[in-house]
Amino acid sequence: MKEEKEYTLVEENNHIEQRASIIYNPPQEKEPILPQIISFVLNPVFMVIYSVAIIFLSTDFTFLFANQFIRFMTPVIFFSCIIPVSGIYFLRLTHVIKDYHLDNRSEWILPLSVFFLSYALLFYYFFSAKLYIWFLAVILTPLILLVIYAIISRFWKISAYMMAIGGMIGCILSVCYNIKGLNLPVLFMILFILAGCLGVSRLMLNRSTPAQVYVGFLVGSVVSYLWVYIGTYWSLILFLRNL
């Protein structure tokens, strides 16, 4: 309940009469905690970190870069998470954006530019290290999805969360099946369960509609799978040329 007081002048008595009016504001429903936790843990800014970490631990990278996991992951964490988060925080601090949800599309240009620049620097770092082309395709996937997200969002809202987790799953599936010939059913089952939990969480928080959730996951997974798949055959072509 909120009380507002207003004052009016009564001419015949030449005094101020105070009138009080009561305005009822219904209490706002609190958002459920568990969906908020899931949305935070599976935030798009963490997906590149999860993707690279899973690929590192599930492939021969563990042997090729033995005892270098922290060193390998440090630039990934720095460029894909710390720089974008710091940039968004600075934009919020300077009131360039009103909130972190970025509901206003007119505020998207600078935040998306921050993410694009960060992912581009990450790609350049590993490109300079001359790693496998298929791995560079994995690193380049967030840039591709970011461009697709920006284009689609001009006409229709799509779930960035589901695009991100779909991109992670697509990359890991493509690496395991097309490059390393690995069959990891337990890992894949866990990833799809997490994607389902994230989709339900976004619906419970009223952040997305079912169509936005489904399309976001489909676009992210298909594009990332095919992109890494193309990177695999491109690396094979380059290898054959050098024979």
Regions found by a protein language model. Give the residues of each.
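Short, Lys/Arg-rich, polar N-terminal cytosolic tail immediately upstream
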Residues: 1-35
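Membrane-embedded catalytic cores of phosphoryl/pyrophosphoryl-handling enzymes
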Residues: 129-243
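Core segments of transmembrane alpha-helices
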Residues: 113-123, 164-169
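Juxtamembrane helix-capping/reentrant segments at transmembrane boundaries
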Residues: 32, 98-114
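Transmembrane alpha-helix boundary signature
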Residues: 88-96, 122-135
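Loop-to-helix transition at the N-terminal end of transmembrane alpha-helices
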Residues: 65-81, 102-106
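The first (N-terminal) embedded transmembrane alpha-helix
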Residues: 38-59
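Membrane-interface helix termini and inter-helical loops of multi-pass transporters
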Residues: 59-68, 96-100, 128-130, 232-243
